[in-house]
Amino acid sequence: MYRFFENFYDWWKNIDKFILFLILFLFFLGLFFSLVSTSLIASDKLDTNSYYFFLKHLIFIGLGVLILFFLSILKEDILIKISLAFFLITLVFLLMVPFIGIEVKGSKRWLDLGILPRFQPIELLKPYFIVFVSILLCQNKNIFYKYLLSGIVLLPIILLLISQPDLGQTILITMVWLTLIFVSGINLYLFFLFFIFTISTSTYLIFFVSKFEYIKIRLISFFNSSSGNNYQADRASDAISGGGFFGRGIGEGTLNSKVPEAHTDYIISVISEEF
């Protein structure tokens, strides 16, 4: 027992306390909003336990805290090996999506392996992608090869995401890669070229690839509010403005019954209206 407290003291002494408290604060803030803003959605719209989303989030946050603590006590070399192994495993999961993935609302992004809860492989892959690319950028001294190798790692992930289709995650993982190479000290001119290429490719996909036509329609509707296709966005905007500075109060919001995905896509609007 003494050895345990000694190890815990060493861990506490070396941990970045500001980041730890910031993470825990965001965890508990998310739990609070999940409790007060999704109970009516769960009971009225999904006809299930009022605390369904809260308990679901509580379980995953508990697992997240345990994993966070476990990984933080590992030595760096062991952490790197674990990250590389899980990067390959999650990449295999992502490769499985086109073949056995579950299609939801026109996009095939989810896996259901039976023994595990349904999940999106890209959500599991992202943290390991960050570690893997960071290793390539830090350990490879040849400037050309380290950026080339990191780009080669990124390319199959992007192609798999585009095939789902999931442009949002494609842009997100690309921006993560751009951030990593920027922090690594890349030449600003080269970084600017990569950035322009990313913007140009995203624009092409949105306006000229039929898979992403729904995004083009959303953009056109957003900039042309008179088209009448902005019902959900307009309701969300009305909810935010209707809440005012102090909000309507817990459980007094009206957006829950006006949009189909109030507990996910429009949760910020739900919170803004009530608080």
Predicted regions located by residue number:
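Membrane-helix boundary/helix-loop-helix interface segments in multi-pass membrane proteins
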Residues: Y2-F21, F25-L26, F32-Q164, N230
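Short hydrophobic alpha-helical segments that form membrane-spanning helices or hydrophobic packing faces
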Residues: S37, P127, I173-M175, T254
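Helical mechanochemical/support elements of P-loop NTPase systems and associated helical scaffolds
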Residues: K75, F129, V133, S163, ...
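Hydrophobic alpha-helical segments of polytopic membrane proteins
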Residues: L84-L91, Y145-I162, L167-F207
